Amino acid sequence: MDIKKIKKVELHVHLDGSLNINTISDILKIEKDEIKNKLIADKKCRDLNDYLQVFDLPIKVMQTKESLIRTSKDLIESFINDNVIYAEVRFAPNKHTTILTLDEVITSVLEGIKSLKVKVKLILCMMRGDDFSDNKKIIDLAYKYKDDGVVGIDLAGAEGLYKTSDYLPLFKYASSLNIPFTIHAGEADGIESINAAISAGATRIGHGVRAIESKECINKLKEKNILLEICPTSNIQTGIAPSMELHPIKKLYDSGVKVSINTDNRTVSNVTLNEEYEILVKAFDFTEEDFNKMNAEAIKHSFLSDRDKQELINILKEAS
């Protein structure tokens, strides 16, 4: 199997966690080695909150139109290198308003992700810990730009500190506007968080790997056809699994839960999507057929129109 030739879909990748080292060095006029030390998380962090500490530098950099456009274009290049045919890039607009308005932030990133080589759409992140009104603005902006490249919303941040269930009214509001959503759950927090995401009506869950702790939860995911956006390397860094060999992705996949493979944060986790595939082959003997199934499910669970989904499915079929 030539992993580089497999056509891939990535549904869970954070823009601010996937910055190009050379670009950041150029913008800040700081040596690359110093940037790496500040931008790449330890292979073993204490927990998710520890892992999230490295995001201070990316947020500092991404405060102008130029930097948002440039960092977005860089991410497109990394998709091309990984043979990605479709990606949904996520970021939190509220983190980038030191100078810009929310509209300027979003339109800058939308300009940056335009590409003739890779189909890319945007997911806007609400943040745990932000005020209800601030998060509601994100939903309204997702609705405003739904025909311009924004396809959905997410809830991200310190899951262990802010319960998923506290945000159910926001997802009820998003549902009233027919805005699709995914929710980070079952990463720092456990089954309770996943159940709350299911109750909210999420069709996808970011990470969700702690579903392995409950057969009932696994059955719910299967029954409701919910896909888990799994990020193997990141999960090891944040301590969800002690090693890749003990990561629950294979058990979840074998049990019939729909899963997709993602990098989460390409720079913070120091990993490409090709490398994630290689790691999984080594740990679990996944086959090309397995990966093709996962990518087909990723397309089906994407926030694209049915017509766009079918176009991508056809591309996968032609390649397999």
Please provide the spans of the model-predicted regions.
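Conserved hydrophobic beta-strand within the GNAT/NAT acetyltransferase core sheet
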Residues: 181-183
